[in-house]
Amino acid sequence: MARLPRWEPEDPKFWKETGSAIAWRTCGITTFSLIFSFATWFVMSAIVVRLPAIGFKFTTMELFWLAAIPGFASGTLRLIHSYFIPVLGTRPVISIATIIKLIPMVWLGYAVQDLNTGFWTFMVIGFLSGMGGGDFSSYMPSTSIFFPKRLQGLSMGIQAGFGNFGVSVVQFVTPWIIGFAVFGAAVGGPQIFTKADAIKGAITVTKDNGVVKDVVINKPELASAITVVKDGNVVKDVVFQETDTIKGIKVDVKKDAAGKIVEVVPTKGIKVDVTRKPTGEITDVTVKNVIKKPMWVQNAAFWYVPFLILAFILCAVFLRSVTVKARGFKGQFEILSTRNRALTHSWNCTITYITTFGSFSGYAAAFPMMIKTIYGGFDGAPDPLAYAYLGPLIGGLIRVITGPLWDKWGGSVGMLYPILGMIGACLALIFGGYLTPTGLEKFPGFVYIMLFMFLMTGTANAATFRQYPIVFAYSPAKGAQMLGWTGAWAAYGPFIFTSLIGMAITKTGSAIPFFAGAAIFYAYANFLNWWYYTRKGSERFDFGNSGGTWWDKLSDGEKEKMKHIDLHQ
């Protein structure tokens, strides 16, 4: 039976005899599917940092746009998904949402193998990848409907927490899985990956008004391989020539009959980069150690295919749908009505969810590119993907841990203090000089502060899963809608955060303007949370199962009145 005829999770007898097993089975299967939804959503953010190294000529801002566009798609799609579950049910929505993500993954896998693939093609693929984030607004409402209020913080914390591990999965697995031919030649050959690091102290460059006047070779072993050509007091050229001990960089590539690369032999050597003005004057000279090796970037997309197929089968076979009172798609917009002050609380919840999950997803998408652009220009620059997975991992894990705590102590309390921590992290980044470093000595501190930011966003986000159904306690359907609605707007986080950080860096040279604005926004959100939900006597307070909620304090008559108002009665 695809649709369950009866579902009363608040009935203790029904929950014990029937509901609990079905609800936890549903949570387990949908969480497995959600992991790979998040992974496919963020796969572009992991791939973009590798595109320049395999030959794609995109600007820094274009790379930020590629990392951002899945977030734009996910936010837009969540606005649609937020109304699906009450109307269509869990089984068809989650099943279709799972299998359709094969389209962008397969397309992306082939696109990265062709250096002629244009920026706008990648933008379309990135937009489609956003389907993996869009369906989150179907997962959360589904889970909220299946569980009683006392377990909603726990169940949704588990689902969102483990589901968010998908972000860590993509950023952790990608560097490893693109390093070998996991699928053989079945899905294509390798690309040529180039890594070039400046040799510290190899040369001393003297400039006058931005033009190189002299180049002194400091390392004796390089003196016989590098020739500085001068005309008077101006350097005209710097020429590199191999010696018996100093080798240039050569690439040994084997191709098939169609001209496609089938093998790349790893090589390393020395390269001299000479930067010139359009008029020919030399503006910079660097000597680099260059490594070229094979890389199978397509694996970063293709390896999700079997897992998506497995998740689809599990969803189609084992999931069930619950009948929820809904008044069609038009009725779903009643969370924006003035009845029972729904509009006010919809606005408040949207702001706080953007603050929590919007920040988590936004920083998760932007973190690799932040590392690359802020610290990637220094000698021995860190690999962004070696650190990027840590933030989402911490943020996802803390959701699972703190979900039960906010059931006990209250969602509004669980949001108040972590948001203060987020404000502190913004100020530390700004005033600690971590956004305008002069060397790598600031990098460890930058990483620690960003990981603290992820910890705080995850903690606060876990509290929302408890709080929002309590705010709309008079209508389980509206509580489910609110989780979908707020999730839709917060899913724009990767788009907004990544694009604004990229713009700030491009236009001002640092991300300081972004984090200053973020701190102000967080302060506003925390004020709303305190005024309406946390302070003594607030309108819809939530002090957890131990301290009670606004709904618990109402009389039966007051509760029935709110329900009648909600239903136009």
What are these regions (language model features)?
Residues 1-39:
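Cytosolic juxtamembrane N-terminal segment immediately preceding the first transmembrane helix
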Residues 104, 118-134, 441-461:
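Hydrophobic core of transmembrane alpha-helices in multi-pass small-molecule transporters
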Residues 303-328, 525-533:
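C-terminal membrane-cytosol helix-exit motif in multi-pass small-molecule transporters
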Residues 41-49, 171, 342-396, 461, ...:
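Extracytoplasmic gate region of multi-pass secondary transporters
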Residues 133, 153-179, 484-497:
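Glycine-rich segments within core transmembrane alpha-helices of 12-TM secondary carriers
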Residues 65-83, 389-402:
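Central cavity-lining transmembrane alpha-helices of secondary-active solute carriers
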